[in-house]
Amino acid sequence: MAKAKKKAPAKLSPLLRSAFEVLNHGLQHYFRSNTTKDMKFALLHVDQAIELLLKERVRVGGKSIHKPNNPKETISIWGAYEILTKELGVAVPEKPDLELLHEERNNIQHKYANPNSEDAAFHMKHAMSFIRRFVNSELKLD
């Protein structure tokens, strides 16, 4: 009888793995060129990565990422901030800069905005600073 292969234990949750995948895709766009198209997709993906990282911390904190009145939907980035700060006591001092990024994302998504490379550089600098800190201090990853 053949022995079944042992599967490696999951090192990252699917939510966290997805956050890193979309972050990687955003960074590929950012470093590929400084066209408005690449800046647009860089910011969309990096903002999504941040939202997923926040949701992962909510999950790790033992809270549901699903809306209480509609379990088919997950909480928004704003819902994640609220749970983190009010229920889990997690400080997010970078929130004002991350709010600007999310506003830029909304402008891209809903108003057809095209960010320039200077604005994208501002958002990427602050986003990456947050991600480095948050992944290390809140998600306990190197």
Give the positions of each predicted feature:
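Charged alpha-helical initiation segments
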Residues: 1-42, 139-142
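Short, hydrophobic, well-ordered secondary-structure elements
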Residues: 39-59
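Charge-enriched, short contiguous segments at helix-coil
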Residues: 12-17, 88-142
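Amphipathic alpha-helical interaction segments
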Residues: 21, 41-48, 122, 126
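Short, surface-exposed loop/turn segments at secondary-structure junctions
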Residues: 33-40, 63-68, 117
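Secondary-structure edge/capping motif, primarily at the C-terminal ends of alpha-helices
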Residues: 26-34, 60, 108, 112-115
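Flexible secondary-structure boundary motifs
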Residues: 54-99, 103-104, 131
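Amphipathic, well-ordered alpha-helical segments in soluble domains
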Residues: 22-25, 45, 52, 100, ...
